[in-house]
């Protein structure tokens, strides 16, 4: 059994005494660019059942102020960019069903742990949703009507920029209370191969009439629409009295119909409150591992909501791998490790190390069966790689934290392949792009996209390889990669100045000359086709997490380093606003709405000034995070923003891949962290306040 499903007796006892889920608001971050998933799910659940407001929303499905299109069973949390998922969409209506026009305005929406509810105003129908790991529970309350409908639209999916593409679907009405089918989709943000989501739906009431449709053309009484690359759906209709409830259990699977039916059986009763209670119990098992004492109820709400989001992804796909047979743990929806290696996975490793180890082992298994460990992976396809081979950071972090349920010898093989074997034409999907330059020149030149940011990330990745190699007694590998971990110095240009400081990360041509472009500045930023991926030189120049002492020397010594940090958090951004991708949440030059800055506030610890870290962190916590629906400063990115907040509330922050936590100031007067092995860490912050 996977650790995700295991229970700790000591934690269960605590959970029974206190309901931590009452402090969780799944709507925090759903608006304002946080793209937080607000529907129903269990920790790491494969099913994430929630509303899709239109097919052009982001990955979480929710978009305030638009109509609800329906409720689909697959989502990601907090991810920007092109959409994935939004598969197997169910909806309810009244009157004559039009498969091309059924979206509804909504009201009275409410998101709670294990439950999402909303009124569909167009149809005078209320919906309640809950979920287990592999199944969704729907409950619809109807008005008096001769035609109350529940239907599934297999042609729907989320389809914003970098669009997913429809491939095919099939639907069959098995009886007057059962429907099964599948939808097949490809592409999206990770340019995935086609993936198939099967479903089996069981209704608690026999339909009075039924039918199917193909490409929007209804065929009443027809039981099946076969797959010929067309969009299909099916409906059940009922005569209802006011207040009648109809319930549906929907199991999904990536393996086939039998597994989908088996997964539906996770829902043992027809009482949605039972499903909700099981979800609440699963969440309390996790949330109770961090017990905070505080009279600040709003802060507790933000904290536990942040912690909740850490455990939404990656998704536990054990037993649901359609690509290869494996006895290894199998997790997916790493979206993306470039975001999550910094805080999300270290937090999981802190309180659920067995699960953290399973995740790392799943990455090793992916390497053995699909070329490389992924930087991102969803719908059982790898891609895309945003920067470095940052699985290396996850492996090193698990190793130095003493997590042992990982085959580290194979993990080291995977890391070395990252560092030595170019991915060829698949540079945005696999491995390290620009690797021939990096290994020949010691940096990725301007001949390749993202050359500067890749070089700095590869240097940190190489240090992670060295850490593991040393731990495994591979001295030769350690010596090679600890040397390569200094390659960032090859892109340190002492001739670049800003705000009175000299020496910054800077792109370099393959002939050794520096990039000379008057339009390119220390504030220039971009995406995949830029030299700085979602960062800029002022920020990237701090990214030497593995050798801060050498960085301090490059910046001119201790006092200059302190001055530069002070300036980074004090000065206003002087560049053109459109140069910065994620400028909406700036603290000085620090774009806390994006991950490359995550470690910087804690770097004062390396010059013995943690009090400045405490001041900066508290300012960010107080001004950039709230309990409102737009209360997350940027894309939550699989819990990354939540993990940054949660760690700093505890008063320490990880330097991922190292056995180091950097100290700041705890927010709560007392915190008890209950470890998986039964040990407890108690943090007491005497006289803590907004000013202390």
Stretch-by-stretch model annotation:
Residues 2-10:
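Bacterial N-terminal signal peptides
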Residues 15-345, 349-393, 399-456, 464, ...:
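Accessory carbohydrate-recognition regions in carbohydrate-active enzymes
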Residues 461:
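ATP-dependent phospho-/nucleotidyl transfer catalytic cores
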